[in-house]
């Protein structure tokens, strides 16, 4: 704090590894890992004007290397007009009037099934009896085949959400009556979905 100015800042680095016991597949038994860097910076002027900037730079194991990290910033502004000197004649009636707004980008890597951890890798069964071959006398011998239950997609990345908020806070009659109204906005993009049908002309399956 210096004079009528006040600032603050914070950086946080996190790294997490989670291991689960008694999993029924190799994929589930592998450690789950992610890491991220988050920051928060604020500024206030004379208890009237406020600004805040936040960011997250996060990495997820679920995506290919070139899509693994995402940058998600946000900012907010506030203005307490009732702290202005010209508002003093109105303080007995309306002792607080504040306008505020925020806007930011949020990332989500908890998409699809928790069993599908590595979207950039194929899921292959090299010993599938249902895809085998029969040969020999009266076709009495069988050799198991190979099946692919999922093809790799290196373009799958963070689900993103743009979020905004505009609000107003009122305090009247020495805060005997308080009113708060907010308008929220959200728009999601890059939503992961499983296709219900894939045409055979794509050549991804054979029966």
What is each model feature region?
Residues 1-207:
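Extracellular/periplasmic, surface-exposed regions of secreted and cell-surface proteins
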């Amino acid at each position: 704090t210096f004079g009528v100015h006040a600032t603050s800042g914070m950086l946080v680095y996190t790294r997490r590894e989670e291991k689960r016991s008694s999993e029924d597949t190799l994929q589930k038994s592998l450690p789950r890992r992610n890491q991220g860097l988050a920051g928060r910076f604020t500024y206030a002027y004379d208890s009237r004007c406020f600004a805040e900037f936040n960011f997250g730079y996060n990495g997820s194991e679920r995506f290919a290397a070139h899509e693994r990290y995402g940058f998600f910033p946000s900012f907010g502004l506030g203005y307490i007009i009732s702290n202005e000197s010209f508002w003093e004649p109105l303080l007995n009636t309306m002792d607080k009037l504040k306008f505020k707004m925020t806007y930011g980008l949020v990332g989500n890597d908890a998409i699809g099934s928790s069993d599908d951890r590595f979207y950039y890798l194929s899921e292959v069964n090299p010993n599938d009896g249902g895809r085998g071959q029969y040969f020999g006398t009266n076709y009495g011998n069988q050799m198991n085949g190979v099946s692919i239950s999922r093809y790799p997609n290196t373009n799958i990345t963070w689900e993103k959400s743009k979020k905004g908020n505009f609000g107003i806070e009122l305090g009247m009659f020495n805060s005997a009556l308080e009113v708060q109204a907010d308008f929220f906005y959200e728009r999601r993009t890059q939503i992961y979905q499983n296709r219900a049908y894939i045409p055979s002309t794509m050549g991804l399956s054979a029966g």
